[in-house]
Amino acid sequence: MPRDEMEACELGDGEGYQPLRLPRVQGKLEEINPIVAAEVAALERRDRSDADYEKVKMLYVIYLRVHEIYDDQARIRLGVRRKKHLGDLTASRGAGLRSFEALSSMIPLPPETGEFDTGGTSSSVRSASGASGGAASTAASGGSASAAASGASGGSASQSDVSSRSRSQQAPGTKGKKQ
């Protein structure tokens, strides 16, 4: 709208530009949460007048409450993703091997290529598997020879059994590398 047309408009009471109003607060927000009350009490007065200090104090309380409500909603909707919480989790679990094992067990690994993977079953795999064809096919498709041999003695082993055995035989930090 051009400026000339704006000046020609007549505005009634309560219309047009109005200064920003402070929010109306019913009751004392700092009484809801003692942590908020402690943080507001620690607010520095500096060189503010009484009216300015009360205004800043009220806005700080509102900010703290909104931040608290946002954190609650984020935990409910998004799950806990804050850095502080994740740091506390790793500190309580302990860093190192235990957390590595927990993380690596959750990530599915691709089938490992064994020493005997030549496109078909080799004679050493056939001799180790004996009459059990299930263990030989498992070893040829990515399992290890020791897993195939153990599968021959105890019946046929499934693919998940073989891959979990071969993972447990590897040292931590050598995921997918041949030893």
From Swiss-Prot:
Biological process annotations from GO: viral process
Region listing for Disordered, in residue ranges: 107-179
Keywords carried by this UniProt record: Capsid protein, Host nucleus, Virion
GO CC entries: host cell nucleus; viral capsid
Top-level lineage group: Viruses
Pfam families (alphabetical): Herpes_capsid
InterPro entries hit by this protein: Herpes_capsid
Biased composition (Low complexity): 118-171
Subcellular location: Virion; Host nucleus
Subunit structure and binding partners: Interacts with the major capsid protein/MCP.
Family: Belongs to the herpesviridae small capsomere-interacting protein family.
Cited function: Participates in the assembly of the infectious particles by decorating the outer surface of the capsid shell and thus forming a layer between the capsid and the tegument. Complexes composed of the major capsid protein and small capsomere-interacting protein/SCP assemble together in the host cytoplasm and are translocated to the nucleus, where they accumulate and participate in capsid assembly.
Protein name: Small capsomere-interacting protein
Species this chain originates from: Equine herpesvirus 2 (strain 86/87)
Lineage, uppermost ranks: Viruses, Duplodnaviria, Heunggongvirae, Peploviricota, Herviviricetes
Gene this protein is translated from: SCP
